[in-house]
Amino acid sequence: MSLNRSEKEAVISDVTSLAAKAQTLVMAEYRGITVADMTKLRSEARSKGVTLSVLKNTLARRAVAGSAFEIVGDQMTGPLIYGFSEDAVAAAKVVADFAKTNDKLVIRGGAFGGKALDVNGVKQLANIPSKEVLLAQLLGLMQSPISRTARVLAALAEKRGGGEAAPADAPAEAQAA
């Protein structure tokens, strides 16, 4: 199906706005993937905040021109699906995880932070934990010294007082009587 000029401009405009918001672009060849598998990939991507698009490569090149993803314009050949995500690792994770279970989806490359990524770069990006997991790990690291100190103080109080109530409680009871 051929697009007329106004439809092409609309596609370019949509993809340009996607590229402006996105941190990551992942490209994968989808030759031979069934419609059911593609639907499953798209629904998984949608749930993770990733936008997948099958575009004509010339339209994709024009859409990313002037953006951080322009550096991968020369890699835009063949039947590709483009994954854009605002989360730095989401697009790479979705595509790499799907490629593990479906050998017909072949990662071709991508871009992140103004740098082109090869296949290994996309896979390394996919192995980075998500933002939520990283924040949870950071919080755990920050809480660890505090909880250790609390355990040491509790053990010290147990050792000194033999498990009795703190001495501050006794004067409060005497004043109430």
From Swiss-Prot:
Keyword Signal: no
Function: Forms part of the ribosomal stalk, playing a central role in the interaction of the ribosome with GTP-bound translation factors.
PANTHER family: 39S RIBOSOMAL PROTEIN L10, MITOCHONDRIAL
Signal sequence coordinates: none
Keyword Signal: no
Top-level lineage group: Bacteria
Annotated GO biological process: translation
Name this polypeptide is given: Large ribosomal subunit protein uL10
Family of the protein in this entry: Belongs to the universal ribosomal protein uL10 family.
GO molecular function: large ribosomal subunit rRNA binding; structural constituent of ribosome
Organism: Variovorax paradoxus (strain S110)
Keywords in alphabetical order: Ribonucleoprotein, Ribosomal protein, RNA-binding, rRNA-binding
GO cellular component terms listed in the entry, alphabetical order: large ribosomal subunit
InterPro entries, per the entry: Ribosomal_uL10, Ribosomal_uL10-like_sf, Ribosomal_uL10_bac, Ribosomal_uL10_bac_type, Ribosomal_uL10_CS_bac
Subunit structure: Part of the ribosomal stalk of the 50S ribosomal subunit. The N-terminus interacts with L11 and the large rRNA to form the base of the stalk. The C-terminus forms an elongated spine to which L12 dimers bind in a sequential fashion forming a multimeric L10(L12)X complex.
